C-alpha cells in the first residue's frame, strides 16, 4: 500500500483507499518545485524517491544535470535518495545493471524487481551499509519471501546476465530499435534508454487500440497513455525480430487511425 501511495497516479490508487500518507509529488526535472516541497516540509521529509526513467508516465528519462542537482540537494539537506529501478534495472537500460549508473548519481537505496528473476515474482531492496543498519529482522519481510524457486530464478538470471555481455548488446539493439521506430509513419517522438522505449503517436491514433491490433497480429505491445506505446522487449531480442515489428507497425496504426 505504501508503494501505491508513492505513485502520482490517482487511477492506480482509487480501488485501494485509504492509503498511507506522507508522500509529496513534484514534477519531474523541476528542481525549484522540489526545493519548495522540501523546504515547506523540512521537518517531515526524510527522502526523495525517483525513477531514473519514468515508465508509467510514458517513458521519460531524467535530465542528467538536473538529477545530479537533485542528488546534491539531498546530500546537503541530509535526505536519502531512493531510486526505483523496478522497470529500468537489471540491464534494461543498457551499459550498466541500473539506469541510475547512466545518469551519474549514487543513491542511498535501490528498489528492484521484474527483470531480477526474468519475470518470476521477485523483489529486492539494496542500501548503503549505514542505511541498511537501520533494518532489524522482521522490519522488511513478506509472507512469501525467500521462496527457494524465486531465489533460484534470480540467481540463474543474474549469472546469465553477468556472463552474456548484455551491457553492450542492449545499448546496440536499443539504438537500432530507436532509429527504426522514429521512421514509422504515425510516430511523432521516440524516447527512452536502452530497451526501455516509448513512442508517441499522432493525434487521433489511440495507443490502446494499436495494442489490441498488435495482439491480433501476434505482437505483445503496451500503452502507457492514450497516445504512447511502451516497448520493453526481452534483452535477447534480435534486430530481425525488431524488423518484423517495424514492418507490421504501420499497418497496425493505419487500421486504428480515426
Name every feature range the model reports, one short phrase each.
Residues 1-258:
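Conserved N-terminal phosphate-binding loop of PLP-dependent enzymes in the Aspartate aminotransferase
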Amino acid at each position: 500500500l505504501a508503494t501505491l501511495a508513492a505513485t502520482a497516479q490517482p487511477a492506480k490508487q482509487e480501488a485501494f483507499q485509504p492509503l498511507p500518507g506522507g508522500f509529496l509529488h513534484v514534477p519531474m526535472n523541476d528542481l525549484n518545485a522540489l526545493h519548495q516541497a522540501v523546504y515547506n516540509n523540512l521537518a517531515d521529509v526524510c527522502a526523495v524517491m525517483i525513477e531514473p526513467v519514468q515508465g508509467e508516465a510514458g517513458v521519460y528519462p531524467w535530465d542528467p544535470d538536473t538529477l545530479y542537482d537533485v542528488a546534491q540537494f539531498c546530500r546537503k539537506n541530509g535526505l536519502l535518495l531512493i531510486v526505483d529501478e523496478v522497470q529500468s534495472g537489471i540491464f534494461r537500460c543498457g551499459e550498466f545493471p541500473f539506469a541510475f549508473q547512466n545518469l551519474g548519481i549514487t543513491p542511498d537505496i535501490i528498489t528492484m524487481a521484474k527483470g531480477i528473476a526474468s519475470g518470476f515474482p521477485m523483489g529486492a531492496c539494496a542500501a548503503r551499509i549505514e542505511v541498511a543498519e537501520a533494518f532489524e529482522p522482521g522490519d522488511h519481510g513478506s509472507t512469501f519471501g525467500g521462496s527457494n524457486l524465486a531465489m533460484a530464478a534470480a540467481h540463474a538470471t543474474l549469472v546469465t546476465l553477468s556472463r552474456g555481455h548484455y551491457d553492450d548488446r542492449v545499448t546496440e539493439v536499443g539504438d537500432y530499435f530507436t532509429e527504426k521506430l522514429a521512421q514509422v509513419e504515425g510516430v511523432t517522438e521516440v524516447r527512452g534508454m536502452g530497451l526501455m522505449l516509448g513512442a508517441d503517436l499522432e493525434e487521433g491514433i489511440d495507443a490502446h487500440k494499436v495494442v489490441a491490433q498488435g495482439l491480433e497480429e501476434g505482437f505483445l505491445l503496451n500503452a502507457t497513455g492514450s497516445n504512447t506505446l511502451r516497448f520493453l522487449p526481452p534483452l535477447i531480442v534480435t534486430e530481425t525480430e525488431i524488423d518484423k515489428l517495424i514492418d507490421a507497425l504501420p499497418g497496425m496504426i493505419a487500421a486504428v487511425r480515426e
